[in-house]
Design a protein with these regions (language model features):
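Long beta-strand-rich cores associated with HINT superfamily self-processing modules
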Residues: 358-394
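Extracellular/periplasmic solute-recognition and catalytic clefts
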Residues: 3-5, 32-33, 45-119, 145, ...
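Short, well-ordered beta-strand elements
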Residues: 4-5, 41-47, 217-228, 252
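Alpha-helical transmembrane segments
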Residues: 405-420
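Cytoplasmic C-terminal tails of single-pass
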Residues: 422-432
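Extracytoplasmic/peripheral linker and loop segments enriched in polar/acidic and small residues
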Residues: 94-96, 103, 127, 132-136, ...
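Gly/Pro-rich hinge or "lid" segments in bacterial periplasmic/extracellular proteins
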Residues: 1-45, 51-54, 195-196, 200-201, ...
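Structural transition elements
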Residues: 157-205, 227-236
């Protein structure tokens, strides 16, 4: 069905609008309805649009209050349109479109398989040190800040660890949360470590200039990807190849469909891979368990896709599970994050942006992945909606007038030609 209608339940008990929020919510007007009973809307009408172009057009014209309620990428797309065109920026600004943005509580990263002899743990203490330095060098070379500039629809804030902002225990966005392996602080600013530092680590790992110091053979790594390449995906894969090439490392792309990719992950045959995680509850444990040894994907069919196994990390994770939020829990989380930063089991990637798109007559709109019943918070000004729709869609009368004039001209020309033909004699002469 292309149309779904939800109406207010007259027997619903009601629920008060929240009185607390995140920093900045009050200034954004998101707490103005504090204590009022929800929902504020009597009817919700959903129209299914198969194509993105007409959906965007209807929103721009004012015929949609929001493009989609649960999706959080349309705000990013409208913001990019504004950045690409002064005309569009002026139009969207004049119409008062609201495009609030936040950092999503999900992450994307490049992982290294702990079971792999080259990028994994290593069989001997000496090999463990070399493999760790190789992972650290690669983590420096993969420039996630550049990724977000080149692929802004998919990018976000560079991750320094496994925990996105907004969770207890996360230090994302602070100087205390900087990953010392990949970044450093210069004049109060966070900057990525240089390629020279990465190359020095690579040499210490036994691969000077990307070649095995014992055999002289070039280092070739395999990148397992979870989709068959499309033109868009190919550009991302090419970008990743270039990141490894900075260190003179050859990266072979092994892109497959998702079923084959999952099979590799379960068997533990991947080497370097791309993965992500969307939390289902807002707690640090929901991310830190992704690196807990007994959750290994290959060994126990868990969600530890890197098959990471560090006794010091696991010991702290078992402590964390029983702790309430507080200084002691923060200390344990800091220690766990520091362990995985040093081991560089992930190149931590990025936390994507979530951004909604709302008309100026829509109030209390805030993008969220964790909260799915966002519509009950919305408040609408229907009088403003009607006025803006009329203002933005005034009929243009000159096209039909032009058509009428063209028809009159064509009719006059046809009539003149007909009369001239009627006055021709047999020799083609026009009679008076």
């Amino acid at each position: 069905d292309r149309r779904h209608v939800l109406e207010r339940n007259p027997n619903y008990r009601g629920e008060p609008y929240p009185g607390e929020g995140m920093p900045g919510d009050k200034e954004a007007g998101l707490l103005a309805d504090c204590g009022k009973m929800m929902p504020f809307i009597d009817k919700l009408v959903f129209n299914a649009e198969k194509e993105a172009v007409p959906l965007k057009a209807k929103f721009i014209q004012g015929y949609l209050d929001v493009p989609e309620i649960e999706r959080t990428e349309y705000g990013v797309e409208f913001a990019l349109d504004m950045a690409d065109s002064d005309r569009v920026r002026k139009e969207y600004t004049a119409r008062g479109f609201k495009l609030p943005r936040t950092v999503d509580i999900s992450n994307w990263y490049v992982g290294f398989n702990w079971l792999d002899p080259v990028v994994g743990k290593g069989a001997t203490p000496e090999q463990q040190v070399r493999n760790r330095k190789l992972r650290q060098a690669l983590s420096i070379a993969i420039d996630w800040e550049e990724y977000s500039r080149i692929f802004p629809k998919k990018g976000g804030e560079t991750a320094m660890g496994p925990l996105p902002g907004g969770l207890f225990g996360s230090r994302h966005g602070t100087l205390a949360g900087v990953n010392p392996v990949t970044h450093r602080i210069v004049d109060g600013k966070i900057v990525r470590r240089s390629l020279d530092e990465a190359k020095a680590l690579l040499a210490e790992a036994g691969y000077p200039n990307g070649r095995d110091e014992k055999t002289g053979r070039p280092l070739v790594l395999n990148y397992d990807y979870q989709r068959v390449p499309t033109p868009e995906i190919k550009s991302e894969l090419d970008w990743m190849v270039k990141q490894f090439a900075k260190l003179d490392i050859q990266l072979e792309i092994r892109a497959t469909d998702y079923n084959q990719f999952q099979d590799k992950m379960r068997k533990g045959t991947q080497q370097v891979f791309f993965w992500g995680w969307l939390a289902d509850y807002p707690d640090a444990e929901n991310y830190l368990f992704l690196l807990y040894g007994p959750n290994s994907k290959a060994r126990f069919d868990g969600e530890n896709t890197a098959n990471y196994d560090n006794p010091e990390y696991d010991k702290r994770y078992n402590m964390l599970r029983l702790m309430d939020d507080g200084p002691a829990k923060q200390k344990v989380i800091d220690e766990m994050v520091a362990i995985v930063q040093q081991d560089a089991i992930w190149s931590f990637g990025w936390f994507p942006y979530a951004s909604g798109a709302y008309q100026p007559w829509v109030y209390n709109g805030k993008p969220s992945i964790m909260i799915r019943d966002m519509a009950k918070y919305y408040r609408i000004d229907p009088a403003m909606r009607v006025a803006k729709q009329a203002e933005w869609n005034r009929p243009s009368w000159w096209p039909p007038l032009l058509i009428v004039l063209m028809l009159i001209g064509a009719g006059w020309g046809t009539q003149r030609a007909f009369r001239k033909r009627e006055r021709l004699n047999a020799r083609g002469e026009v009679l008076a």
